[in-house]
Amino acid sequence: MKWITREHVKVDRVACPWLIKNFVDKDAEFVFVAPDKVMDEAKRLDAIPYDVKNVELGHHGKECSFEAILKKYKLIADPALVLLGKIVNGADTDNSLYRQSEGPGLQAVAEGFRHLGYKDDHALNAAEWIVYDALYAYCKQMVRQGKLDGMFAK
């Protein structure tokens, strides 16, 4: 299946493809286009839009697109993914929903990746996914230790 979103990816538009590829659609293909072209291209390519306004897999209230995907594809049964969703939310939004302490750190790392000069959004995603692999491992460890809000919960 094809999945489409806005170009010049930031936190949620890197986290969502990682989540989709690992837990929803192992054969996923990702398309990144100008914001004003997403819906037209989604229709033309028969692609699923995500992290754009007014779509099912977008922001709703203070929840980010990663969380919409968790809910839609019933991934909320995995408490480590739920914790990762809170961290992504904290990095992608004003962090007022969960006040997840790890969120600002992820935001800083993601911003750093944007300044490393990757040739396009595909290359940036490929490079940055290791961060999400590591964060997921961290979240699994926090769950095993009973720290469902992460190590640095307030």
Enumerate the predicted regions with their spans.
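A charged, amphipathic interaction segment
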Residues: 71-154
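Conserved, aromatic- and glycine-enriched, well-ordered alpha/beta core segments
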Residues: 2-6, 13-77
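Histidine (H) residue identity feature
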Residues: 8, 59-60, 115, 122
